[in-house]
Regions:
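Double-stranded beta-helix
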Residues: 108-171
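Short loop/turn motifs at secondary-structure junctions and domain boundaries
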Residues: 40, 59-60
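Short acidic-glycine-tyrosine-enriched beta hairpin
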Residues: 15-18, 39, 68, 75, ...
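Short, conserved beta-strand element in jelly-roll/cupin
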Residues: 46-53, 61-80, 115-118
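A short, N-terminal "cap"/entry segment at the start of jelly-roll beta-barrel domains
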Residues: 1-44, 143-171
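Short acidic (Asp/Glu) patches
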Residues: 31, 54-55, 96-98
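Short beta-strand His + acidic residue motifs that chelate non-heme Fe in jelly-roll/DSBH
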Residues: 59, 78-79, 87, 95, ...
């Protein structure tokens, strides 16, 4: 049986310590890219996301990858299609591509893993995070944003997503 070239690349061991990864201040939270598509031969991308209490990710849909949410600390209400789950530490929620989803962080804040499959080496979550964030000076949450995003900022994000073909904001 012939193996896919990306699968062969995934055979290289990768280890990322808890204090390692590419830390970015992203949309008011902290995103640490732990495993890239390149690291895993295109099998997955893993991003550790820490959010302030009350943060809401807008309703959106991915077209090229599936997204899993593994809650490490805190809590969030996660909606995927018609399913709503109050997720706490240790819970996992799977969001298949083409199904709209969103979350609202609970009063404890949260730290969770986004597990995206397959890992997209171009035009995926890694590119989106880098294009819409800044390097974190330390792997800590940024200050709480003083204001909500402006309509112009939201439209800019919508345009970026549409141009990439990766995802779409449904707001």
């Amino acid at each position: 049986m012939k193996q896919d070239a990306t699968l062969e690349k995934a055979l290289e061991p990768v280890a990322v310590r808890s204090d390692e990864g590419e830390a970015r201040w992203w949309l008011g939270g902290l995103a640490v890219i732990k495993a890239t598509a390149a690291d895993t031969g295109g099998q997955m991308t893993i991003v550790e996301v820490t959010e302030h209490p009350g943060v809401e990710a807008p309703l959106h849909v991915h077209y090229r990858d599936d997204e899993g949410f593994w809650m490490l600390e805190g809590n969030a209400t996660i909606e995927v299609g018609e399913m709503t789950i109050e997720a706490g530490a240790g819970d996992y929620v799977f969001g298949p591509r083409n199904i709209p989803h969103r979350y609202k962080v609970g009063d404890q804040g949260c730290r969770m893993l986004f597990i995206l499959t397959p890992g997209l080496t171009s035009g995926g979550i890694e590119d989106l995070i880098r294009a819409t964030s800044e390097p974190a000076p330390s792997p800590t949450l940024p200050p709480v944003p003083a204001e909500e995003p402006t309509p112009e900022e939201i439209e800019g994000l919508k345009s970026l997503l549409k141009e990439s073909g990766y995802a779409e904001l449904l707001i």
